[in-house]
C-alpha cells in the first residue's frame, strides 16, 4: 500500500473538522425507529412492519415511520436539551478520533479510529434531525468542543497507539454512562429520541470493545477522573448553550 504524505493526513483532518462542525451531517444508516409504531387503528405494530421503501428514501433525514409523539412544552424543552448534549458529545467524539487518527502510528489503528468516527457521523445526523423535529438547535459551542477534543486526541495518540486506544475505551465507557442517564431522564413518551439513544449506546459499546480488543490499555485513574470532569463541563454548558 502506498504511504500518504503527512501533509495529506493534515489536509484530510482539516476537511473532516470543517464538515463535522459546520456542514449538515449525513447518515449512512436510517434514523432508528421506535420498538412499536402506531397504525391507523392506533394499535401498536411490530417494528419492521412499516414500509421498508419509505425508510430508505432519505437516509440522512428523520424517519417518517417513527411515531408522531405529542410532548408538552416542558417535555419538548427537556428532550431538546438532552439531545443537544448528545449531539455535542458526538462532536467531541469525532474530534477525539480525528485527532488520534492524525498521529496514529499504525494504519490499523488509524483505520479503526476513522471507522468509529464514521459511525459517530450517523449519530450526529440522527441528533440533528431530532433537534429539528423538536424545534431546537445544536450547541453554539460546538467549535470549542471540537478544538478541545481534537487537541486531546492528538496528545493521547502521541503517547502511542495502545494508550490512544485506551482513551477510546474510557471515552466510550463514559459515553455509555451518559446515555444511560439520559435514557432515564427523557420524557416517557419521547420514543423517537429514546430509539436514537438506544442505537447510539449499542454503537458506543461496540467501539469500546473494538478498541480494547485492538490492544487498548487501561488509563490511570487520575486521567479517567480528569476526562469525567471535562465531560461534565461540556454537558452542563451544552444543555443550555
Model-based region annotation:
Residues 1-241:
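Non-heme di-metal
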